[in-house]
Amino acid sequence: MTKKKLIAGNWKMNGTLGANAALLQALRGGLEAGAYQNVDVAVAVPAAYLAQVQGLVEGSAIALAAQDVSRHEAGAYTGEVSAAMLQEFGVRYVLVGHSERRQYHGETDEQVAEKAQRALAAGITPVVCVGETLAEREAGQTEAVVKRQLAAVIHLNGHCISETVVAYEPVWAIGTGRTATPEQAQQVHAVLRAQLAAASEHADRIRLLYGGSMNAANAAALLAQPDIDGGLVGGASLKAQDFLQIIAAAA
């Protein structure tokens, strides 16, 4: 079964009202000018800009994504944003378990699984992020780490795991300019695909994204791998031309 590739931009904690408008105008123009109907495109924006970006992408091929969601339904959780709130802004995807959330906010595998569950219940596709640190890779633990991270999500959401997207982001390659080789990335994606296949008969439907310094120069080689179904793009998604080149590589 042929899946549409998914190229999702993660703006992280970047943007201004003016810069967002200019970036999305350029992105819309580029998408309308090119033949990219076979690629799904999303932008994950800071929560403060969800309303603005919802308006800016309306009627376009760009789907709105959020960078995080609360594992709680509602209530006294100051600073958190619920899945129901994201749903009201037309959010289609939400990142859960990004390495920066795990690293700086101490998110556990179980909490990430709960966030995925909240998103799924609200009809939002969770983009479940998994990946190993440099120390873990050098200790030969890559496979064990990503399988452990994904297992928690499968355990809690097994019945609808085929409704998720999984992103492999080697932590040592995020924002460092270092990239996993296409072969290294494919090796891990194949492990994840096998783990998903053991949990769901619809594993072939699940899109596996690569997220670790994907850019215009390396996107085509990464996306040519059999189990890489798209990209979770950081820095390059803040420049319209770079992001469009990655989308073109997926088309």
Curated annotation (Swiss-Prot):
Localisation per UniProt entry: Cytoplasm
EC number(s) stated in the UniProt entry for this protein: 5.3.1.1
One MF annotation (Gene Ontology) recorded for this entry: triose-phosphate isomerase activity
Location (main, coarse): cytoplasm
CC per GO annotation: cytosol
Isomerase as UniProt keyword: yes
Pathway entry: Carbohydrate biosynthesis; gluconeogenesis; Carbohydrate degradation; glycolysis; D-glyceraldehyde 3-phosphate from glycerone phosphate: step 1/1
Keywords: Cytoplasm, Gluconeogenesis, Glycolysis, Isomerase
GO biological process: gluconeogenesis; glyceraldehyde-3-phosphate biosynthetic process; glycerol catabolic process; glycolytic process
Classification via CDD domains: TIM
Enzyme superclass (EC): isomerase
Sequence similarity: Belongs to the triosephosphate isomerase family.
PANTHER family with a match to the protein in the record: TRIOSEPHOSPHATE ISOMERASE
Name of the molecule in the record: Triosephosphate isomerase
Species this protein is from: Paracidovorax citrulli (strain AAC00-1) (Acidovorax citrulli)
Name of the encoding gene: tpiA
